Every structure is written in C-alpha cells, then in structure tokens.
C-alpha cells in the first residue's frame, strides 16, 4: 500500500466516525477530498425539474431561484432565463438576439419558487393546458449596458461570454419604432400563464 493510499484509508476511518450521526455525510467522498484535495461543489438546495409547454423548468425552493430553458433550433441554442427572487434579478440569455440581458426587480405577477412548486404539484400534469393570462413586455435600455458581469448567473455565464449585456426596462406599450425596422427577433418565456416578452429589431 502506498503512502497516499494509507492517507486515504486513515482519512476514511477518521471521517466515518464524524459521519456516524450525519446521514448526508459520505466518508468515502470526504476522505478523497482530504487526501487528494478533491471536493465537489454542492448546491445550497435541491433542484426540482419539470417539462412545461416545451420548456424545461428547474426550481430551487431553498435558494428561491428558477431556471427556464427553451429548446433551440436551426443550429442556434435556446434561451435560458434565471429568475433569482432572493436577489430581485432576472438574467436572460437569448442566443438569437446575440446578447444577454438583466431585469432589475421581479414583477409580482411572477410566482416565487415556493408558489411555482405548489402550482406544478397541484396541476398534476395539466399545467401545459393553462392559457396566457397576462404579459410583461420589455425593451432594451440602449444607454444602460451592464458593466458588472458578476451579476450574471453561473448558468448563463458561459453563454454570455464575449457578448454585449444590457438592462431591460418595462415597455410603455406605445413604442412603434420596431415597425419601421427591417427585421426583429422575438423572445418570450411563459411562466404559469404569464408571458415575459422581449423584441429586438434592426
């Protein structure tokens, strides 16, 4: 037995004693971390996954966060929206627009993680059938680029690498300028009967 293996075995025995009353403790994994400097990153809470309206929704009640992933097409990745209720922030990666966006504040129409989990569980598979009840429209604040990229959630950081990031603001509903543009990219995410929409035109 090598000296490294001896350290691992010894660490396993020691950690097994400390793990005796902790059902979530894995002495083997802890021993590997102690002997070889390995340690897995652990989320602060458990993620629940649902397939709704063609979107993959992940909900973490402890962190009060939601992730909505849309399927891509035509060689373009789908958009990813992270709703962080704890920080009051929405992070949105829209590959078709070639940019990423931040929304400061989470509209009260959007359910928090606990409400969304309760909704999915009580719907018993019928959530797909709920129609759109309201919509939240956003426009890009051209003069407000995001300078602190640490605000980007880890789930979209790679997708937003090297792209422009802007704040989105609620639309007043009277902006007809896109009608004069040549073409537009439309993006929306549906969350329990509420549409979050964005339109970028050139």
Curated annotation (Swiss-Prot):
Signal peptide span: 1-25
What keywords are assigned to this protein?
Answer: Antibiotic, Antimicrobial, Cleavage on pair of basic residues, Disulfide bond, Fungicide, Signal
Q: Which cysteines are joined by disulfide bonds?
A: 100-160, 184-201
Q: Name one Pfam family in it.
A: BRICHOS
Keyword Disulfide bond listed? The answer is yes
Q: TM segments?
A: none
GO BP terms, alphabetized:
defense response to bacterium; defense response to fungus; killing of cells of another organism
Q: Any idea where the BRICHOS domain is?
A: 73-168
Residue ranges annotated as propeptide in the record: 26-181
Q: Which domain of life is it from?
A: Eukaryota
Instruction: Please give the function described in this protein's UniProt entry.
Output: Has antimicrobial activity against the Gram-negative bacteria E.coli and P.mirabilis, the Gram-positive bacterium L.monocytogenes and the yeast C.albicans.
Protein name (database record): Arenicin-2
């Amino acid at each position: 037995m090598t000296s490294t293996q001896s350290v691992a075995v010894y660490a396993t025995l020691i950690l097994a004693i400390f793990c005796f009353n902790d059902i979530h403790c894995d002495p083997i994994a802890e021993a590997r971390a102690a002997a070889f400097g390995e340690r897995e990153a652990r989320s602060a809470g458990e993620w629940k996954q649902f397939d709704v309206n063609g979107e993959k929704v992940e909900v973490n009640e402890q962190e009060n966060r939601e992730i909505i992933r849309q399927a891509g097409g035509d060689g373009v990745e789908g958009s990813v929206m992270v709703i962080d209720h704890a920080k009051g922030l929405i992070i949105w990666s829209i590959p078709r627009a070639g940019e990423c966006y931040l929304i400061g504040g989470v509209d009260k129409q959007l359910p928090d993680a606990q409400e969304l989990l309760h909704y999915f569980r009580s719907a018993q598979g019928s959530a797909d059938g709920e129609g759109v009840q309201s919509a939240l429209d956003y426009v890009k604040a051209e003069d407000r680029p995001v300078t602190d990229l640490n605000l980007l959630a880890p789930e979209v950081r790679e997708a937003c690498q090297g792209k422009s990031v802007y704040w989105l603001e609620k639309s007043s509903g009277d902006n007809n300028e896109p009608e004069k543009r040549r073409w537009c990219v439309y993006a929306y995410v549906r969350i329990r009967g509420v549409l979050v929409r964005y339109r970028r035109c050139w």
